[in-house]
Amino acid sequence: MRSIAGAILGLWLIASGGAEAPDAGQAVVSPSISVVAAGDIADCGSDGLQFPDAFRTAGLIAPTDTLVLTLGDNTYPIGAATEFADCFQPTWGGFKERIRPSPGNHDYMTTDAGAYFDYFGAAAGPDRRGYYSFDAGGWHFISLNSNADAGVGSAQYAWLQADLAANSDTLCTLAYWHHPVFSSGPHGNDRRMADVFQLLHAAGAEIVLVGHDHVYERFAPQDAAGNTDPERGVRSFTVGTGGARLYSLRKPQPNSEVRGASTHGVLRLTLSSTDYRWAFVPVDGAAPRDDGSAPCHR
């Protein structure tokens, strides 16, 4: 796999100021599609919205962004209906019609993630199970639920096997969920989705997006055991920078290529039917802190 990537990030500076959430609007159709992703978004705190950075990250999302992927923990602290109404809706809710969500552990702090499923409705997938797939721009997208069993023999694992088999002719595949299999953040590596990661690797998937650790990190293409695989490996991104309080990085994990933890932002992916480009866009208005490109697996 060819790639053009930035070097290891230095210290990021958090800019002051804010941005208003954009108006909802129709996405612009083009030969490629632009997809924005982040998790760990709207923190209501105990006295209303304490962390206005969800407004600032919402301000990065443009009418030309076809899809918006949430990587779990859509609201804090407990994923309650009032949090979706008071904190998510005024920020990222401005483009709700373009959101394809995934749930996080804080969404499940309200029984069965009920408020999450009520808020997103059909966009959250069928039967309130929290996993589903769809196609856009020549890509196959898979939203998974890392709060539910995804090991070998589970219903989610069997569903993913069938979904990948049914879409084996699709050249480019992207999957996303909440808990990272690999992370240099304080939560560290979480093996609950390792079987899923291996399934995706075997099927030739290109990208995995996750949140949970409130940092930005990009890993080299690898398999579920952490072995580098430049030709067929899955490139994973942690984008837990959607608005909640940022964490500190820990010792870098093997194959971590870029990481930073001092600014909120979103990952913007430009996807064509044969390749992809990525850029981490910070809220301070500076140039992307990480950007690159690669072809889909042949």
Question: Model-predicted segments: where are they?
Answer:
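N-terminal Sec signal peptide cleavage junction
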Residues: 16-20
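Extended active-site neighborhood of metal-dependent phosphoesterases/phosphodiesterases
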Residues: 46-48, 76-172, 187-202, 207, ...
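Short hydrophobic/aromatic-rich beta-strand segments that constitute the beta-sheet cores
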Residues: 143, 277-280
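Short, solvent-exposed aromatic-acidic interface loops
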Residues: 279-289
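N-terminal active-site segment of His-dependent metallophosphoesterases
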Residues: 22-84, 150-155, 162, 183-184
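Bacterial N-terminal signal peptides
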Residues: 5-15
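Residue-level marker for buried hydrophobic side chains located in beta-strands
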Residues: 35-37, 68-70, 101-102, 175, ...
